[in-house]
């Protein structure tokens, strides 16, 4: 039961950090490539 309570307290923290960093990454991509439907660094 103690491990389950530890899991319940760790999972929200990790998900908050993950989604926060993902949102920051998307914001920075949109800052350098605004309104890009196809990203220039993916085209060959």
Curated annotation (Swiss-Prot):
PANTHER family noted in UniProt: PHOTOSYSTEM I REACTION CENTER SUBUNIT IX, PTHR36082
Protein origin, superkingdom: Eukaryota
Chief place where the protein resides: plastid
Keywords per UniProt: Chloroplast, Membrane, Photosynthesis, Photosystem I, Plastid, Thylakoid, Transmembrane, Transmembrane helix
Function according to Swiss-Prot or TrEMBL: May help in the organization of the PsaE and PsaF subunits.
Entry similarity comment: Belongs to the PsaJ family.
InterPro entries in the record: PSI_PsaJ, PSI_PsaJ_sf
Segments passing through the bilayer: 7-27
Topology with respect to the bilayer: Single-pass membrane protein
Transmembrane helix listed as a keyword: yes
Native source species: Spinacia oleracea
Official protein name in the record: Photosystem I reaction center subunit IX
